[in-house]
């Protein structure tokens, strides 16, 4: 009897110890606080009192432009992009981006659901672990938690997001970390959210008038050199052609004869399924011309193609290296605009497809840049090229958040079209209406880089295209001296009649404009 009672006591002790062990595993072990399942259920989205040890003093940050104050935890770095975002980073541990979004004509739900379309669809390997609505600090709050595939060491692929509605403004806190730093990072996030307080906003500051910058372009290649003197602008063209094979000349030469002008700068596009004919590329340079290629990271026409994830995993290295080797063999300058118009949701490399994380685009840019350098394609000139209007026009989609940095960008591309009124949402915009504010803003952020209008045009419908062209060609050289190259998009695009011969008057206006002294010069010369 005594032995049975003793044995029973041991059983109870064993049971209690086992229960404690199971509870420990559930909280800290695999699948616990550092696992994906825990990301979906830990804290249930409500910030708790932070208990991390403070080895240095926290500091207050006030963003008067967007209107809020927070306390920055020890060890975190802070950057304010006025009117765009406040970015807090703990290097190697976590990143928090704060966006203050006025709602204007939409509801908070519309803003959140459209912004989070990729989460709902599961694009880009995204897995949503939790989403809910609750009340936080007295404000309606929407919370989302998700993960995606890790694409490289140090990649922060665990996300938590808070949207707090204050009157007609949503404060979005987009936070990311990784499994290894989840506990520490979420404590810091809780600390920041506890400290947050909305304030009156002063709005985005006005950009100063740019100083007039006269720049000469001199780029030497193996066989040719590109020279654009001060006070001159080089005209380029996108003319109908077959991608990959190009076959530019049979349509281009007759156009040049009618205009009495040789276009020394041509552009084309490429997707992952594009294979260039090297000989065709070389013919362009042998004829005294320079080429710009828009390398677009998708499979042409594939809907909802989120190939940046596979690109960063190395799946397309062979294609990228083949492009790099071909461009290297050309020897002369090749302009490359990787992932152009990334701030438009018509581009599947936009952050709209990737949980609003613009860092994925920047990682892809750096990845491609590194491969080209490894292949010795030092003649390639990298062009960073947003669209002039972000869509959706939300703070998280601002072009500055996509900028990979001065070290990997050579030129800045501008793109803005006069869409005319072919579609109900279209608006007739004059050249200066498009480019004056854009030029002023870009000169503030990128004044050390030369500019290129990578593609633009005017529609025929909705106004006087001939007068539009005349005013544009007068203003371009008079008011935008840092724009050294301008490329006309000479094609019909849906209902948009961008082609130069959309009317005899438009064609004649362009031909007359090319006669201006600023456009009459030779830019491509033999090296010797």
Place the predicted regions along the sequence by residue.
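N-terminal targeting sequences that direct proteins away from the cytosol to non-cytosolic compartments
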Residues: 2-94, 166-167, 176-209
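Signature of long, low-cysteine stretches enriched in small and polar/charged residues
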Residues: 120-165
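Substrate-binding cleft of secreted/luminal carbohydrate-active enzymes
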Residues: 206-242, 449-528
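N-terminal carbohydrate-binding/catalytic regions of secreted carbohydrate-active enzymes
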Residues: 235-326, 475-483, 491-494, 507
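Aromatic- and acid-rich polysaccharide-binding/catalytic face
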Residues: 263-269, 399-430, 458, 489-491
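Substrate-binding cleft of extracellular glycoside hydrolase catalytic domains
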Residues: 278-380
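Glycoside hydrolase catalytic-domain groove-lining segments
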Residues: 279-296, 411-462
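Aromatic-lined carbohydrate-recognition surfaces of secreted/lumenal glycan-active proteins
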Residues: 369-397, 448-461, 485-491
């Amino acid at each position: 009897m005594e032995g049975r009672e003793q044995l029973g006591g041991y059983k109870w002790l064993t049971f209690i110890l086992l229960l404690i062990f199971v509870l420990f595993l559930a909280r800290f072990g695999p699948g616990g606080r550092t696992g994906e399942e825990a990301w979906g259920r830990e804290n249930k989205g409500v910030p708790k009192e932070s208990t991390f040890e403070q080895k240095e003093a926290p500091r207050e940050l006030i963003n008067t432009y967007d209107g809020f104050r927070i306390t920055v935890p020890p060890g975190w770095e802070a950057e304010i992009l006025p009117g765009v975002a406040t970015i807090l980073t703990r290097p190697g541990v976590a990143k928090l981006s704060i966006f203050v979004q006025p709602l204007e004509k939409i509801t908070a739900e519309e803003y959140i659901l459209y912004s989070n379309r990729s989460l709902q669809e599961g694009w880009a390997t995204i897995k949503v672990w939790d989403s809910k609505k609750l009340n936080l600090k007295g404000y309606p709050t929407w919370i989302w938690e998700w993960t995606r595939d890790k694409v490289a060491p140090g990649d922060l692929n665990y996300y938590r997001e808070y949207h707090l509605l204050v009157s007609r403004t949503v404060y979005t806190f987009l936070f990311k970390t990784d499994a290894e730093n989840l506990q520490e990072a979420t404590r810091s996030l809780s600390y920041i959210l506890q400290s947050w307080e909305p304030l009156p906003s002063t709005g985005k500051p006005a950009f100063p008038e740019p100083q007039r910058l006269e720049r000469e372009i001199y780029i030497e290649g193996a066989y040719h050199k590109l020279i654009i003197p001060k006070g001159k602008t080089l005209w380029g063209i996108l003319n109908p052609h077959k991608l990959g094979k190009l076959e530019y000349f049979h349509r281009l030469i007759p156009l040049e004869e009618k205009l009495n002008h040789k276009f020394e700068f041509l552009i084309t596009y490429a997707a992952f399924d594009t294979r260039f004919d090297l000989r065709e590329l070389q013919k362009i340079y042998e004829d005294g011309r320079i080429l710009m290629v828009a390398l677009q990271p998708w499979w042409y026409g594939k809907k909802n193609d989120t190939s940046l994830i596979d690109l960063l995993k190395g799946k397309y290295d062979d294609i990228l290296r083949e492009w790099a080797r071909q461009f290297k063999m050309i020897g002369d300058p090749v302009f490359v605009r990787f992932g152009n118009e990334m701030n438009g949701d018509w581009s599947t490399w936009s952050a709209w497809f990737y949980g609003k994380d613009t860092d994925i685009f920047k990682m892809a840019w750096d990845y491609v840049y590194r491969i080209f350098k490894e292949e010795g394609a030092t003649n390639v000139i990298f062009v960073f090229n947003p669209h002039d209007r972000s869509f959706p026009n939300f703070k998280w989609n601002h072009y500055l958040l996509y900028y990979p940095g001065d070290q990997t960008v050579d030129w800045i591309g501008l793109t803005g079209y006069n869409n005319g009124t072919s579609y109900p949402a279209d608006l007739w915009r004059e050249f200066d209406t498009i480019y004056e504010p854009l030029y002023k803003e870009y000169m503030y952020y990128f004044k050390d880089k030369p500019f290129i209008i990578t593609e633009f045009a005017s529609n025929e419908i909705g106004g006087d295209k001939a007068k539009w062209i005349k005013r544009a060609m007068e203003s371009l050289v008079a008011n935008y001296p840092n724009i050294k190259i301008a490329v006309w998009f000479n094609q019909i695009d849906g209902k948009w009649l961008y082609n130069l011969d959309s009317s005899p008057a438009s064609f004649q206006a362009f031909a007359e404009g090319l006669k201006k002294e600023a456009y009459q010069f030779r830019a491509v010369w033999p090296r010797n």
